[in-house]
Amino acid sequence: MQVLRTPESRFAGLADWPFAPHYAEITDAGGARLRLHYVDEGPRDGAPVLLMHGEPSWAYLYRKIIPALAARGHRVIAPDLIGFGRSDKPAARGDYTYERHVAWMSAWLEGLDLRGLTLFCQDWGGLIGLRLVAAFPERFAGLVIANTGLPTGAGMTDGFKAWLDFSQNVPEMPIGLIVNMGTGRDLTPAEIAAYDAPFPDETYKEGARQFPMLVPVTPEHASVAENLAAWKVLEHFPGPVVTAFSDGDPVTRGGEAIFQSRMPGALGQPHRTLRGGHFLQEDCPDDIVDIVDAVARPESQS
């Protein structure tokens, strides 16, 4: 496996990004060693919060949420998925599969050995993060689920069809502009540049190119069986489950219903519909902080 590593200089002086990098080395099933980056802020003994990003962003998406949750006493951990952010980037599209992403993040999570986690997940952060919950339910105390899903081959929305077509056919993938198109507010040039920073050129974007192809939208997809098995675990997850989908996301709009109906911890919870686009972390970070804080406070889990 050929692995690319974005030069550290690409991350110097990013707007609103004061966080020290942390790195963990994981070993792929094929023997390749991969360096995974994560942010780890707040008190070590704070109630831990795991923030998981998706396509095609990185932990920068949580830059306004991380310090606010840390200020409320939480230990806040935000990893970059392999292929994104400061994490290593396999150079071949064929190196990226759904199951490999789950395995990579599982190895990282086991290495940290955290328990009592509250997960906030959006986009592929949910497709992978919810698989982590199913694999390690004993490590998670509560979930906040936003603009994501755990599909099992039942088709796709028109919004996802449009995104799939765009992602596979655009000659050069404009990462920062893609994020900007998925927000309710206009990002600044400096913010757009920060989303572009992990990708010096197109060779670094194979993970971003491949992600849309990995969503299990057809019954024959290789990961349908694994997601069905994950749902069987999630349907018995005992902790609180709060949905926080946005009203302006054509890809996942309405997706909260399946979580509210199938997960017992969602019953009677203060679910929210937030005003924002697909990347609602950019549009309503304060709301997200309040929601996550309410779920993650130890007294709310007693």
Swiss-Prot record:
Uppermost EC category: hydrolase
Catalytic activity: 1-haloalkane + H2O = a halide anion + a primary alcohol + H(+)
Statement: the UniProt record of this protein carries the keyword Hydrolase: yes
Active site: D123, D249, H278
Gene Ontology MF terms: epoxide hydrolase activity; haloalkane dehalogenase activity
Pfam families associated with the record: Abhydrolase_1 (PF00561)
Keyword terms: Hydrolase
NCBIfam families, alphabetized: PRK00870.1
Role of this protein: Catalyzes hydrolytic cleavage of carbon-halogen bonds in halogenated aliphatic compounds, leading to the formation of the corresponding primary alcohols, halide ions and protons.
Name recorded for this polypeptide: Haloalkane dehalogenase
Organism: Caulobacter sp. (strain K31)
